[in-house]
A protein has these predicted regions:
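Bacterial N-terminal signal peptides that target proteins for export
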Residues: 1-6
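N-terminal signal peptide c-region/cleavage motif recognized by signal peptidases
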Residues: 12-16
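Active-site-proximal alpha-helix that buttresses catalytic centers in soluble enzyme cores
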Residues: 20-111, 115-118, 127, 157-182
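Generic beta-sheet signal
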Residues: 31-33, 138-146
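...with weaker cross-activation on analogous glycine-rich loops/strands in unrelated enzymes
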Residues: 125-135
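A short, structured loop/turn motif at beta-sheet edges
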Residues: 135-140, 170
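Residues that scaffold the ATP/ADP-binding catalytic core of kinase and kinase-like folds
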Residues: 154
């Protein structure tokens, strides 16, 4: 049983590394949209007294999350992956990920906030994100810092904290071109 587990582990590691390398190749070329899940946080859900305008009422980046965000930015620079714009959810964990990683103030983009509970509101958020993605035609990359739920709804992919999913429009949805883990 242990041999099987080790063999399985050894098969998975090269796939993850290959996916990351392929993702970096895309990002170096520019012109792509990156859905970046915020870096590691201190908890699992926002408290009952949540206020979008107060970081004290939200879960925030942990010390490891801040290090991870710094690593994200360092790797974008080291891998020569050009960035044209950074859009972010208004949640502090997303804003801080963007600020630390890219050393600039991101553009607030409310549709990247956690998806609302109401189906009509969710659909409106997804439509606004898709409109932004479809309209993007820059030569460098567009980074959109958001949440797990948003990325899953857009792509069907469940990224880890701080993972980047590179996408392009395809039909009514998105096609995942690559992923980069940090």
């Amino acid at each position: 049983m242990i041999r099987f587990a080790l063999a399985l582990f050894m098969l998975v590691i090269p796939v993850a590394a290959h996916a990351t390398d392929a993702g970096w190749a895309l990002l170096r070329d520019g012109g792509h949209v990156v859905l970046l899940r915020h870096a590691m946080v201190t908890g699992t859900s926002d408290p009952a007294n949540f206020d979008i305008d107060s970081c004290a009422t939200q879960i925030n980046l942990s010390a490891r999350g801040k290090q991870q965000a710094s690593k994200i930015g360092a790797l974008f620079a080291a891998r020569a992956a050009p960035i044209e714009r950074v859009l972010s959810s208004r949640y502090c964990r997303c804003l801080d990920t963007a600020r630390i990683a890219f050393e600039a103030e991101p553009e607030l983009f409310a549709p990247l906030d956690l998806l609302k509970g109401d189906d009509a509101q969710k659909a409106a958020q997804i439509a606004a994100i898709m409109k932004e993605i479809r309209a993007y035609s820059g030569s460098d990359n567009l980074v959109m810092v958001t949440h797990l739920e948003d990325i899953v709804a857009l792509t069907g992919v469940s990224p880890r904290e701080g993972e980047a999913v590179i996408v392009e429009p395809q039909g009514d949805g998105l096609r995942v071109l690559g992923r980069v883990t940090f």
